[in-house]
Protein backbone atom coordinates (compact mmCIF):
# COMPACT_ATOMS: atom_id res chain seq x y z
CA UNK A 1 0.00 0.00 0.00
CA UNK A 2 2.59 2.57 1.10
CA UNK A 3 5.50 1.65 -1.14
CA UNK A 4 7.86 4.33 0.14
CA UNK A 5 7.83 6.66 3.12
CA UNK A 6 10.28 9.00 4.80
CA UNK A 7 10.32 11.40 7.74
CA UNK A 8 12.79 14.26 8.15
CA UNK A 9 12.55 16.58 11.17
CA UNK A 10 8.78 16.30 11.36
CA UNK A 11 8.23 16.43 7.60
CA UNK A 12 6.47 13.30 6.36
CA UNK A 13 6.53 11.92 2.83
CA UNK A 14 4.67 8.89 1.50
CA UNK A 15 4.17 7.28 -1.91
CA UNK A 16 1.66 4.53 -2.59
CA UNK A 17 1.93 1.45 -4.77
CA UNK A 18 -1.07 -0.24 -6.38
CA UNK A 19 -1.83 -2.90 -3.75
CA UNK A 20 -4.05 -3.13 -0.69
CA UNK A 21 -7.17 -1.43 -2.03
CA UNK A 22 -10.62 -2.46 -3.18
CA UNK A 23 -10.76 -1.40 -6.85
CA UNK A 24 -11.49 -4.01 -9.52
CA UNK A 25 -9.65 -4.64 -12.79
CA UNK A 26 -8.24 -2.59 -14.54
CA UNK A 27 -7.82 -0.31 -11.52
CA UNK A 28 -6.70 -3.01 -9.12
CA UNK A 29 -6.27 -2.45 -6.30
CA UNK A 30 -5.42 0.89 -4.68
CA UNK A 31 -6.59 3.38 -7.29
CA UNK A 32 -6.68 6.85 -5.74
CA UNK A 33 -7.73 8.79 -8.84
CA UNK A 34 -11.32 9.93 -9.06
CA UNK A 35 -11.37 10.79 -12.77
CA UNK A 36 -10.22 7.58 -14.45
CA UNK A 37 -13.52 5.69 -14.68
CA UNK A 38 -13.29 3.70 -11.45
CA UNK A 39 -16.22 3.25 -9.05
CA UNK A 40 -16.32 6.43 -6.91
CA UNK A 41 -17.11 4.38 -3.83
CA UNK A 42 -13.99 2.31 -4.34
CA UNK A 43 -11.88 5.43 -4.74
CA UNK A 44 -13.26 6.90 -1.52
CA UNK A 45 -12.56 3.65 0.32
CA UNK A 46 -9.04 3.50 -1.11
CA UNK A 47 -8.31 7.08 -0.06
CA UNK A 48 -9.43 6.27 3.46
CA UNK A 49 -7.27 3.13 3.54
CA UNK A 50 -4.18 4.95 2.29
CA UNK A 51 -4.60 7.88 4.67
CA UNK A 52 -5.10 5.63 7.68
CA UNK A 53 -2.05 3.58 6.70
CA UNK A 54 -0.03 6.79 6.78
CA UNK A 55 -1.59 7.91 10.06
CA UNK A 56 -3.38 10.81 8.37
CA UNK A 57 -7.01 11.87 8.84
CA UNK A 58 -8.69 11.22 5.44
CA UNK A 59 -10.72 14.40 5.93
CA UNK A 60 -7.49 16.42 6.22
CA UNK A 61 -6.09 15.63 2.78
CA UNK A 62 -6.07 18.21 -0.02
CA UNK A 63 -6.39 16.88 -3.58
CA UNK A 64 -6.07 18.69 -6.91
CA UNK A 65 -7.80 18.76 -10.28
CA UNK A 66 -4.55 18.28 -12.19
CA UNK A 67 -4.30 19.68 -15.73
CA UNK A 68 -0.58 19.54 -16.69
CA UNK A 69 -0.04 23.24 -16.04
CA UNK A 70 1.92 25.43 -13.64
CA UNK A 71 -0.80 27.04 -11.53
CA UNK A 72 -0.46 26.84 -7.75
CA UNK A 73 -3.12 27.03 -5.04
CA UNK A 74 -2.30 28.11 -1.49
CA UNK A 75 -4.54 26.26 0.97
CA UNK A 76 -5.24 26.17 4.69
CA UNK A 77 -7.96 23.50 4.70
CA UNK A 78 -9.49 20.82 2.46
CA UNK A 79 -11.83 22.05 -0.27
CA UNK A 80 -14.97 20.74 1.41
CA UNK A 81 -17.98 21.53 -0.78
CA UNK A 82 -16.03 23.98 -2.93
CA UNK A 83 -15.00 22.99 -6.47
CA UNK A 84 -11.52 21.50 -6.61
CA UNK A 85 -9.45 23.99 -8.64
CA UNK A 86 -7.54 23.17 -11.82
CA UNK A 87 -4.00 23.40 -10.48
CA UNK A 88 -0.87 21.27 -10.50
CA UNK A 89 0.60 22.32 -7.17
CA UNK A 90 -0.78 23.02 -3.72
CA UNK A 91 1.08 24.81 -0.94
CA UNK A 92 0.20 25.17 2.73
CA UNK A 93 1.54 26.66 5.94
CA UNK A 94 -0.95 24.62 7.96
CA UNK A 95 0.82 21.95 9.97
CA UNK A 96 -1.05 18.65 10.00
CA UNK A 97 -2.76 19.32 6.67
CA UNK A 98 -1.74 16.67 4.13
CA UNK A 99 -1.26 17.54 0.46
CA UNK A 100 -1.69 14.85 -2.19
CA UNK A 101 -0.65 14.50 -5.83
CA UNK A 102 -1.88 11.83 -8.26
CA UNK A 103 0.35 10.19 -10.86
CA UNK A 104 0.72 7.20 -13.16
CA UNK A 105 4.08 8.01 -14.88
CA UNK A 106 4.40 11.75 -14.17
CA UNK A 107 6.68 12.84 -11.34
CA UNK A 108 5.08 13.41 -7.92
CA UNK A 109 7.07 16.17 -6.22
CA UNK A 110 6.81 16.59 -2.45
CA UNK A 111 8.45 19.54 -0.69
CA UNK A 112 8.62 20.63 2.95
CA UNK A 113 10.46 23.18 5.07
CA UNK A 114 10.23 21.81 8.62
CA UNK A 115 11.34 25.12 10.18
CA UNK A 116 8.74 27.40 8.58
CA UNK A 117 6.06 24.71 8.50
CA UNK A 118 5.44 25.16 4.77
CA UNK A 119 4.80 22.19 2.47
CA UNK A 120 3.93 21.65 -1.18
CA UNK A 121 2.90 18.88 -3.54
CA UNK A 122 3.33 19.24 -7.30
CA UNK A 123 2.43 17.22 -10.39
CA UNK A 124 5.30 17.37 -12.89
CA UNK A 125 4.73 15.67 -16.20
CA UNK A 126 6.43 16.73 -19.41
CA UNK A 127 4.15 19.78 -19.89
CA UNK A 128 4.45 20.82 -16.24
CA UNK A 129 8.23 20.53 -16.33
CA UNK A 130 8.36 22.86 -19.33
CA UNK A 131 5.73 25.23 -17.88
CA UNK A 132 7.67 25.53 -14.63
CA UNK A 133 5.35 24.02 -12.05
CA UNK A 134 8.24 23.13 -9.73
CA UNK A 135 9.75 26.65 -9.63
CA UNK A 136 6.23 28.02 -9.19
CA UNK A 137 5.68 25.77 -6.17
CA UNK A 138 8.99 26.74 -4.59
CA UNK A 139 8.26 30.45 -5.14
CA UNK A 140 4.86 30.05 -3.49
CA UNK A 141 6.52 28.31 -0.55
CA UNK A 142 9.05 31.13 -0.21
CA UNK A 143 6.24 33.69 -0.12
CA UNK A 144 4.90 31.85 2.94
CA UNK A 145 8.29 31.94 4.66
CA UNK A 146 10.07 28.83 3.40
CA UNK A 147 13.79 28.93 2.66
CA UNK A 148 14.89 26.81 -0.34
CA UNK A 149 18.04 25.87 1.57
CA UNK A 150 15.84 24.24 4.24
CA UNK A 151 13.38 22.55 1.88
CA UNK A 152 13.41 18.76 1.86
CA UNK A 153 12.38 17.35 -1.53
CA UNK A 154 11.26 13.85 -2.41
CA UNK A 155 10.15 12.65 -5.85
CA UNK A 156 8.24 9.42 -6.23
CA UNK A 157 7.83 6.59 -8.72
CA UNK A 158 7.69 7.82 -12.32
CA UNK A 159 8.46 6.62 -15.83
CA UNK A 160 12.23 6.63 -16.30
CA UNK A 161 14.34 8.02 -19.12
CA UNK A 162 14.99 4.53 -20.48
CA UNK A 163 11.26 4.02 -21.06
CA UNK A 164 9.72 7.42 -21.82
CA UNK A 165 10.02 7.35 -25.61
CA UNK A 166 9.06 10.56 -27.44
CA UNK A 167 9.50 11.99 -30.95
CA UNK A 168 12.85 13.66 -31.59
CA UNK A 169 11.18 17.05 -32.04
CA UNK A 170 9.51 16.78 -28.63
CA UNK A 171 12.76 15.80 -26.94
CA UNK A 172 14.47 18.81 -28.51
CA UNK A 173 11.70 21.17 -27.40
CA UNK A 174 11.83 19.97 -23.80
CA UNK A 175 15.64 19.87 -23.68
CA UNK A 176 15.74 23.47 -24.91
CA UNK A 177 13.96 24.42 -21.68
CA UNK A 178 15.51 21.80 -19.38
CA UNK A 179 18.64 20.09 -20.80
CA UNK A 180 18.77 17.57 -17.95
CA UNK A 181 15.59 15.93 -19.28
CA UNK A 182 17.32 14.83 -22.51
CA UNK A 183 17.44 11.02 -22.58
CA UNK A 184 17.57 7.93 -24.75
CA UNK A 185 15.54 4.75 -24.38
CA UNK A 186 17.10 1.41 -23.66
CA UNK A 187 16.56 0.60 -27.34
CA UNK A 188 18.28 3.73 -28.63
CA UNK A 189 15.42 6.10 -29.50
CA UNK A 190 14.68 9.65 -28.27
CA UNK A 191 13.36 9.86 -24.73
CA UNK A 192 12.82 12.20 -21.79
CA UNK A 193 13.83 11.86 -18.15
CA UNK A 194 11.37 14.13 -16.37
CA UNK A 195 12.64 13.18 -12.91
CA UNK A 196 16.15 14.31 -13.88
CA UNK A 197 14.68 17.55 -15.16
CA UNK A 198 12.79 18.14 -11.91
CA UNK A 199 15.90 17.56 -9.81
CA UNK A 200 17.94 19.88 -12.01
CA UNK A 201 15.35 22.61 -11.49
CA UNK A 202 15.33 22.04 -7.74
CA UNK A 203 19.13 22.25 -7.63
CA UNK A 204 19.09 25.60 -9.42
CA UNK A 205 16.41 26.81 -7.00
CA UNK A 206 18.70 26.05 -4.07
CA UNK A 207 16.91 22.91 -2.89
CA UNK A 208 19.74 20.51 -2.10
CA UNK A 209 18.20 17.99 0.33
CA UNK A 210 16.63 15.75 -2.30
CA UNK A 211 15.94 12.09 -2.94
CA UNK A 212 14.50 10.36 -6.00
CA UNK A 213 12.58 7.09 -6.05
CA UNK A 214 14.39 4.35 -7.99
CA UNK A 215 11.07 2.95 -9.24
CA UNK A 216 10.12 3.24 -12.92
CA UNK A 217 6.34 2.99 -13.14
CA UNK A 218 6.39 1.55 -16.66
CA UNK A 219 8.75 -1.24 -15.58
CA UNK A 220 7.13 -1.99 -12.21
CA UNK A 221 4.13 -4.30 -11.99
CA UNK A 222 3.54 -2.89 -8.50
CA UNK A 223 2.71 0.58 -9.83
CA UNK A 224 0.17 2.12 -12.19
CA UNK A 225 1.49 3.26 -15.58
CA UNK A 226 -0.57 5.11 -18.15
CA UNK A 227 2.03 4.58 -20.86
CA UNK A 228 2.01 0.84 -20.27
CA UNK A 229 -1.69 0.18 -19.66
CA UNK A 230 -3.63 3.31 -20.75
CA UNK A 231 -6.78 2.51 -18.73
CA UNK A 232 -5.45 2.20 -15.21
CA UNK A 233 -5.45 3.68 -11.72
CA UNK A 234 -3.48 6.46 -10.08
CA UNK A 235 -0.82 6.42 -7.39
CA UNK A 236 -0.54 9.19 -4.81
CA UNK A 237 2.20 11.06 -3.03
CA UNK A 238 1.44 12.67 0.34
CA UNK A 239 3.32 15.32 2.32
CA UNK A 240 2.53 16.91 5.68
CA UNK A 241 4.28 18.47 8.65
CA UNK A 242 3.93 17.88 12.38
UniProtKB/Swiss-Prot annotation:
Single GO MF descriptor: S-methyl-5-thioadenosine phosphorylase activity
Record's keyword terms, sorted: Copper, Hydrolase, Metal-binding, Oxidoreductase, Transferase, Zinc
Keyword field contains Cell cycle: no
Keyword Transferase in annotation: yes
Residues given in the record as Zn(2+) binding sites: 68, 106, 123
SUPFAM superfamilies referenced in this protein's UniProt entry, alphabetically: CNF1/YfiH-like putative cysteine hydrolases (SSF64438)
Superkingdom in the source lineage: Bacteria
Transmembrane annotation, as ranges: none
A Pfam family that the UniProt record links to this protein: Cu-oxidase_4
Reaction equation(s) it catalyzes: adenosine + phosphate = alpha-D-ribose 1-phosphate + adenine; S-methyl-5'-thioadenosine + phosphate = 5-(methylsulfanyl)-alpha-D-ribose 1-phosphate + adenine; inosine + phosphate = alpha-D-ribose 1-phosphate + hypoxanthine; adenosine + H2O + H(+) = inosine + NH4(+)
Enzyme Commission designation: 2.4.2.1, 3.5.4.4, 2.4.2.28
Cofactor: Cu(2+); Zn(2+)
Family of this protein: Belongs to the purine nucleoside phosphorylase YfiH/LACC1 family.
Quaternary context: Homodimer.
Stated role: Purine nucleoside enzyme that catalyzes the phosphorolysis of adenosine and inosine nucleosides, yielding D-ribose 1-phosphate and the respective free bases, adenine and hypoxanthine. Also catalyzes the phosphorolysis of S-methyl-5'-thioadenosine into adenine and S-methyl-5-thio-alpha-D-ribose 1-phosphate. Also has adenosine deaminase activity.
Annotated protein name in UniProt: Purine nucleoside phosphorylase SCO2081
